[in-house]
């Protein structure tokens, strides 16, 4: 290509301005500009299924038993192009499921197996996911057969669960309902490193400073480095890494030991060869490789000669059956450091009995030493983990039960409440990590409840702020939080600084009495009060409206709430209420963008909500920043009118504060934060602000505000169609 546009004989026939793989992006030109792309994902333009397709309804038509039968058959149907170890694909399928679910992190709820994201970059090409492309390709005939009735996300998780069943474990259950995405996620921060296995996520040497929200120690790993900290064996240091990373996946010490042991009871590591012969990962592979990566085109590279992690060997004597052999070998033998054929650090037993060695994956007449990773040795050497391991060793049934429950938690943690689970194998038991909420009353007089709220002495700001605070905790990432359950009245939420405990206590006292009088749940009354406040504010602006409301929220109790698990939902900032708990390295407008994405809102919904909430008097602690109106409590478009008025000039005052002055007179009219001014500064957000500032769009502003408000209030109403 010589780049001469229009030269049809010797030049490139493609207009370079339209090329998809070249050119400089806006982000490259202006790296500090607010990037709204994370709010514009997973829409109809990328989804081939059409707007009328509803996976959660389609999966109900699935022949569940036939699918499971086919998966059982797949486990022992070894394919020549990628042979099964010992004739059983169980270990491979479990690793695929584990690595899909294990990317979840509790801090922001992102990652996990709920979207089928392992099919896309970067996860499909992570160093920790070497050869999992083969597992998904082995599943393709089953996906092809059952089609739209089973998502990749569900199938990837189910395959690991069925693998355990096929090897003798009684699993705890399974819930269908994970919907596929169709392109890589733009909102997930996997780390700032520019190279695989980079580790620029710590700022000290004691391994306690892993960057939030990350839950893996190096770029491209699921949790810890199996060879040791930064590839150097040290089981006690690795134990610290294990505890931190599993904790950030919402697992306690017992669950951590169970998952580590149960994951390593079956299958093996692969490092019997030279890693330099592996081809590039899937995203960098040649077009003729058709999406498969790490292809060895130099040596055999399959079966006993496979290289994945570089560690070589099985953990147990019988790697295709569920048993207690992991603890038997780990606790009864002494172990020494060795190097695998691929050059990776691993632990091997000293003076092991021949009958305790696992056989070769291809020739049962050959036996090899079992191996342990540094993480396994951490289970043996860390005193807390060791005590748990010894109990599991002495009580195999207890171990199997704890593991089955932990596996279920691992693979369902990002699905939200149990009401979202579909299928015949959903456990009846309510689990506290599912944040259970009882069914609410729908048969009460909504009009009477609204009348009592309107007659109370609550201000518009108090009603709207309380409803907002109750609902804003919702995270679309793992479907946690939200207004349903009214957990804002329970610990820890009632004491969060962002919820203004003194104001909250006053408002809840009044709303709880109204709930008791009308038979409504407190959760419903909180939302209803916000709606009443908005209706009053719209009337003050000259518009009579009814804010949509769907009754039926329930009230959770302390017994239904794992208070500690809700700590990660505490808002440390809220641009919608113009509040920061403290100064952060990240710019306030970027924090608001992250919050907006988690809440499932678009850029124009964010815009209209901020503009409306400012004039309703909902700022945290009643600050006046961004309140560009002299009619507080009226749902007007004044925020946008005054933001876009060139009669004003914006002057920096101090960190994150600005003065809005009259351009001619110079007097201060208002103050603002960066969150306010970004709606006039960012070209995209300004285009939305101008729409809402127009003289003919006062009604549209209210209509759009109410629609966005209702979306937030109902974000966790999975019971609604």
Swiss-Prot record:
Highest taxon in the source lineage: Bacteria
CDD domains hit by this protein: catalase_peroxidase_1
GO biological process: cellular response to hydrogen peroxide; hydrogen peroxide catabolic process
Residues at the active site: 99 (proton acceptor)
Entry's cofactor comment: Binds 1 heme b (iron(II)-protoporphyrin IX) group per dimer.
CC cofactor: heme b
GO-annotated cellular components: cytosol
Cross-link (Tryptophyl-tyrosyl-methioninium (Tyr-Met) (with W-98)): 223-249
Binding site for heme b: 264
Pfam families: peroxidase
Alphabetical keyword list: Heme, Hydrogen peroxide, Iron, Metal-binding, Oxidoreductase, Peroxidase
Coiled-coil ranges from the UniProt annotation: none
PANTHER family found in the cross-reference section: CATALASE-PEROXIDASE, HYDROPEROXIDASE I, BIFUNCTIONAL CATALASE-PEROXIDASE
Protein family membership: Belongs to the peroxidase family. Peroxidase/catalase subfamily.
Protein name: Catalase-peroxidase 1
Organism of this sequence: Legionella pneumophila (strain Corby)
Lineage: Bacteria, Pseudomonadati, Pseudomonadota, Gammaproteobacteria, Legionellales
